[in-house]
Swiss-Prot record:
GO biological process: fatty acid metabolic process; isoleucine catabolic process
Residues bound to FAD: 174-183, 207-209, 319, 330, 387-391, 416-418
Family: Belongs to the acyl-CoA dehydrogenase family.
UniProt key word DNA damage: no
Cofactor(s) named in the record: FAD
Any single GO CC term annotated in Swiss-Prot or TrEMBL for this entry: mitochondrion
Keyword Flavoprotein: yes
Name the record gives this protein: Short/branched chain specific acyl-CoA dehydrogenase, mitochondrial
Modified residues (Phosphoserine): 183
Modification sites for N6-succinyllysine: 70, 284
UniProt cross-references to CDD domains, sorted A to Z: SCAD_SBCAD (cd01158)
Lineage: Eukaryota, Metazoa, Chordata, Craniata, Vertebrata
Gene label: ACADSB
């Protein structure tokens, strides 16, 4: 299968360009600042530079970033408001993600994927989030959690069975959290009891993202509660398995187009062959995937904040009060400069964590830093943007209030901000 960049570049020729008109409909894509347009990585060693800037990308990464930006503006932006109001992701958006190759970015071409870099995944999530954070997290979960776990821990048979489906048509869902297992995720109560060649799952899960559309559920259940978290094991459960019940989607503040549902398991029989990896290693797999996933969430929050910022700045440059532009007031200039600096810092933290992961270097502390900081900054940025736009920013006629609502989840899911601070402090303690 030809690479993602090639396919996207071919498709991009069919996409028309859109430019923001100040205070036009929020379906129109936002202005993009020059500072966020990074250059491709060209002749670095020839120029005597041994270490490229973090915002310098390979040709493939630049093509992916550019093509996903066009896809998001053309095919997602016109539907964002409707999807938010209806709490439903449009089928055309999901189909588009698969058709563009965005649901199997790092998966080997042997299984129908693209075989691109982890930073490519980060760039895709960031660009999608500039337009709609719901679509971004839909893509993020598939790539950083589901695909990654199967790629790393699946048997050859499991890879051959599931990866081609996950890259072309099937949505995956990661099932860890429970009513009594949120931040304390390994206090889960879902059981998996062995009966012959099967394991029988009983219990429930909460806050399961993408559950409404998922065809495959990666479920964490305990095969031996007497040994605590060391009994947690990963199971691959197909949607049509008898006894698996998917509840009504939650009515959420933000990320409304991304379904979040409770699940119930009533004597769900799962073949022993559907155990992912080793028995009792589920907690290790979950920790590992969440460490990577936190970089993905950092990218989501970064993109969300940048998208909101890009939409707002043209307004304050054109809005006239007291005979001059809002942007000409020094007090507002300082606020804008402060937010822009924070966005740049969040971007560098996120890209650095991604590059460390790609290089096989320790990255857990840096991933937590990126996730923590980007999430906090997303909340601050979107709040400021509403203030800068004034009354219109508070209405649903424009996207700023949605960015604000979507941003809040960043400090909560895939490890709350305080959990990230705990992780960072733990590593600092060990370093000294």
């Amino acid at each position: 299968m030809e690479g993602l960049a090639v396919r996207l570049l071919r498709g991009s020729r069919l996409l028309r360009r859109n430019f923001l008109t100040c205070l036009s409909s929020w379906k129109i894509p936002p202005h993009v600042s020059k500072s966020s347009q990074s250059e491709a990585l060209l002749n670095i060693t020839n120029n005597g530079i041994h270490f490229a800037p973090l915002q310098t990308f390979t040709d493939e990464e630049m093509m992916i970033k550019s093509s996903v930006k066009k896809f998001a503006q053309e095919q997602i932006a016109p539907l964002v408001s409707t999807m938010d109001e209806n709490s439903k992701m449009e089928k055309s958006v999901i189909q588009g993600l698969f058709q563009q190759g965005l649901m199997g970015i790092e998966v080997d071409p042997e299984y129908g994927g693209t075989g691109a870099s982890f930073l490519s995944t980060v760039l895709v999530i960031e660009e999608l989030a500039k337009v709609d954070a719901s679509v971004a997290v839909f893509c993020e979960i598939q790539n950083t959690l589901i695909n990654t776990l199967i790629r790393k821990h699946g048997t050859e048979e499991q890879k051959a069975t599931y990866l081609p489906q996950l890259t072309t048509e099937k949505v995956g869902s990661f099932c860890l959290s429970e009513a009594g297992a949120g931040s304390d995720s390994f206090a889960l109560k879902t059981r998996a009891d062995k009966e012959g060649d099967y394991y029988v799952l009983n219990g429930s899960k909460m806050w399961i993202s993408s559950a409404e559309h998922a065809g495959l559920f990666l479920v964490m259940a305990n095969v031996d509660p007497t040994i605590g978290y060391k009994g947690i094991t990963s199971f691959l459960v197909d949607r049509d398995t008898p006894g698996l019940h998917i509840g009504k989607p939650e009515n959420k503040l933000g990320l409304r187009a991304s379904s979040t549902c409770p699940l119930t398991f009533e004597n769900v029989k799962v073949p022993e062959a559907n155990i992912l990896g080793q028995i009792g290693h589920g907690y290790k797999y979950a920790i590992g995937s969440l460490n990577e996933g936190r970089i993905g969430i950092a990218a989501q929050m970064l993109g969300l904040a940048q998208g909101c910022f890009d939409y707002t700045i043209p307004y304050i440059k054109e809005r006239i009060q007291f005979g001059k532009r809002l942007f000409d007031f020094q007090g507002l200039q300082h606020q804008v400069a402060h937010v822009a600096t924070q966005l740049e810092a969040a971007r560098l933290l996120t890209y650095n964590a991604a590059r460390l992961l790609e290089a096989g270097k320790p990255f857990i502390k840096e991933a937590s830093m990126a996730k923590y900081y980007a999430s906090e900054i997303a909340g601050q940025t979107t709040s400021k943007c509403i203030e800068w736009m004034g009354g219109v920013g508070y209405t649903k006629d424009y996207p700023v209030e949605k960015y604000f609502r979507d941003a809040k989840i960043g400090t909560i899911y895939e490890g709350a901000s305080n959990i990230q601070l705990n992780t960072i402090a733990k590593h600092i303690d060990a370093e000294y």
